[in-house]
Amino acid sequence: MNARRKKRLALATALIGGVAAIASLLLYALNSNLNLFYTPTEIVHGKKDTGVKPEIGQRIRVGGMVTVGSLVRDPESLHVEFAVHDAAGGEVMVTYDDLLPDLFREGQGIVAQGVLIEGGKLEATEVLAKHDENYMPPEVAEAMGQTHEKLEYDSTQKTGY
């Protein structure tokens, strides 16, 4: 092999190696920023089709209804804990250390984004409440099935006091 061909081969090899390295770094960055949506039942029992459960430490989104009577507030801080359930009976505890949205209530649909810290416990970094009595994220509506009913609220639930 002459010198010119060796130079071309080395250049082509370096170029292919560089493209492969950039592609792998790009895929790694995209994978670390991926937030998958799970229902409480899927967190507990795994996805229907594959049985895959989220791993401890994985960033996920979970959607469902806030279980009535599960909200516990710390009087000394903004820390709150509540349970989220779906129609299939799965339930996940969510902890959150910030102000809850104004529309947040027990019995309402929410989507919480955060890190799974135990098998059935999510440490949320963001909590989103539904916008009005008719709106529900498509994933939550599908997970809730036909059991979602319009809830009636008393005056204390409407005012939040």
Swiss-Prot record:
<dbReference type="GO" id="GO:0017004">
    <property type="term" value="P:cytochrome complex assembly"/>
</dbReference>
<dbReference type="GO" id="GO:0046872">
    <property type="term" value="F:metal ion binding"/>
</dbReference>
<comment type="function">
    <text>Heme chaperone required for the biogenesis of c-type cytochromes. Transiently binds heme delivered by CcmC and transfers the heme to apo-cytochromes in a process facilitated by CcmF and CcmH.</text>
</comment>
<feature type="transmembrane region" description="Helical; Signal-anchor for type II membrane protein">
    <location>
        <begin position="9"/>
        <end position="29"/>
    </location>
</feature>
<keyword id="KW-0812">Transmembrane</keyword>
<keyword id="KW-0201">Cytochrome c-type biogenesis</keyword>
<dbReference type="InterPro" id="IPR004329">
    <property type="entry name" value="CcmE"/>
</dbReference>
<comment type="similarity">
    <text>Belongs to the CcmE/CycJ family.</text>
</comment>
<keyword id="KW-0472">Membrane</keyword>
<keyword id="KW-0997">Cell inner membrane</keyword>
<feature type="binding site" description="covalent">
    <location>
        <position position="131"/>
    </location>
    <ligand>
        <name>heme</name>
    </ligand>
</feature>
<keyword id="KW-0735">Signal-anchor</keyword>
<protein>
    <recommendedName>
        <fullName>Cytochrome c-type biogenesis protein CcmE</fullName>
    </recommendedName>
</protein>
<keyword id="KW-0479">Metal-binding</keyword>
<keyword id="KW-1003">Cell membrane</keyword>
<feature type="topological domain" description="Periplasmic">
    <location>
        <begin position="30"/>
        <end position="161"/>
    </location>
</feature>
<dbReference type="GO" id="GO:0020037">
    <property type="term" value="F:heme binding"/>
</dbReference>
<dbReference type="GO" id="GO:0005886">
    <property type="term" value="C:plasma membrane"/>
</dbReference>
<feature type="binding site" description="axial binding residue">
    <location>
        <position position="135"/>
    </location>
    <ligand>
        <name>heme</name>
    </ligand>
</feature>
<feature type="topological domain" description="Cytoplasmic">
    <location>
        <begin position="1"/>
        <end position="8"/>
    </location>
</feature>
<keyword id="KW-0408">Iron</keyword>
<keyword id="KW-0349">Heme</keyword>
<dbReference type="InterPro" id="IPR012340">
    <property type="entry name" value="NA-bd_OB-fold"/>
</dbReference>
<dbReference type="InterPro" id="IPR036127">
    <property type="entry name" value="CcmE-like_sf"/>
</dbReference>
<keyword id="KW-1133">Transmembrane helix</keyword>
<dbReference type="Pfam" id="PF03100">
    <property type="entry name" value="CcmE"/>
</dbReference>
